[in-house]
Amino acid sequence: MKTSLGKAALLALSMMPVTVFASHWSYEGEGSPEHWGALNEEYKTCQNGMNQSPINIDATFKTHLSPLDTHYIDGPITLINNGHTIQAALKTTTADTITIDGTPFILQQFHFHAPSENTVHGKHYAMEMHLVHKNAKGAVAVVAVMFEQGAENTELNKLWATMPEQAEQTAKIVTQMDLNALLPIDKTYWRFSGSLTTPPCSEGVTRIVLKHPLTLSSAQLAKFSHAMHHDNNRPVQPLNGRVVIE
């Protein structure tokens, strides 16, 4: 079952940049999150799934999680406005990886949501970045980094400088960026089993939410919001008995 779920999530992940422009799901009106499950037979999990993301992180179970092992050296090469988010793509031969439970996961892309999708004790952050990875078996792991409004984020400016302002536009990233600078120094985290937060909402995704937020300025947040024209966060979903560990 886990293998099939992982393959479904991988398929959705690999197809997203190509199909997302034609998709009729959205964050507003008849295509908004509460209607996703009825829009397409392939989206039924958005409505019927029991391990959906995002969630509100409140009660947690303390355990001995291994430190998050990140190995980011390449950085992104293009920035895409797909109408749903701003997404950074990497070269197909990237060496950017994380290691979870001894297994390497290769970074596929990363993108942003404003306000945050996951909440902590009911609190939304100004923005949330999702770093999407997969391993050799097709399993998907997503690392979330929160941003609160405050000081300008210098590294984020390297992305924002080439941000496409219209949907279906792609821009080349001209300034080499250090992806490690978009991670907090303290990489302690919460972990739970979840799903993709966009259709088809495939489950079997390892979700990791870093505890310590970064900052971005009000101007940086406004630029993202202007490009999106709307909030792009799915509401939190029921835990349905799931346990969040830390």
Swiss-Prot record:
Primary subcellular site in the record, as a coarse category: periplasm
Compartment(s): Periplasm
Position of the signal peptide: 1-22
Superkingdom of the source species: Bacteria
EC number: 4.2.1.1
InterPro entries: Alpha_CA_prokaryot-like, CA_dom, CA_dom_sf, Carbonic_anhydrase_a-class, Carbonic_anhydrase_a-class_CS
Active site: 84
Binding site for substrate: 197-198
GO CC terms of this entry: periplasmic space
Domain Alpha-carbonic anhydrase: 23-246
Cofactor: Zn(2+)
One GO MF term attached to the UniProt entry: carbonate dehydratase activity
SMART domains tied to this protein: Carb_anhydrase (SM01057)
Annotated S-S bridges: 46-201
Function text: Reversible hydration of carbon dioxide.
Family that this chain belongs to: Belongs to the alpha-carbonic anhydrase family.
Protein name (Swiss-Prot/TrEMBL): Carbonic anhydrase
Organism per entry: Klebsiella pneumoniae
Classification of source organism: Bacteria, Pseudomonadati, Pseudomonadota, Gammaproteobacteria, Enterobacterales
